[in-house]
Amino acid sequence: MVPAMEKATGLKFDMFHLETKGKYGRAGSELFAYCLVKDKAAGITNLEDPKSLFKKAKDAIYKAYHKKGERWTAGEEAFLKTGLDAAGIPADEFAKNRKNADVQALADSWKASYDVGKIQGIPAYVVNGKYLIMTKSIRSVNGMVELIGELAKK
């Protein structure tokens, strides 16, 4: 859906991770931020690209949690292993780089979205940093694209 909205509106959509969600929230933010930093270095800007490390990690964690009922009772290392294995990132590489400045700056930048998440829940869409779309009122992808286009012009 995001690539279709980007194409139709000419806007760039950025995904944020909310570290307040889930037991391993900060670890998740650092994992996703590291994947995004590596994607950017590889020239991958489309987060739906099958080569995107972010997509691979995100999809693996989503599937494990929502489809398989995984709650990672074995701890943070097991949680991280799910995303790292899917993205093909060695655990020692991640451990060495998870606290680097680029990763921390990106993960910290997502904290501004917490208040939006409290209002809308997830996923939440904010247009140009000003307009929060209440997704419960959206009836179709085309309706969402049209609304985003209108809000972007304001």
Model features per residue range: what roles?
Residues 21-28, 50-54, 72-77, 87, ...:
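Solvent-exposed, acidic/flexible segments
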Residues 67-84, 126:
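Charged/polar, low-hydrophobicity segments characteristic of intrinsically disordered regions
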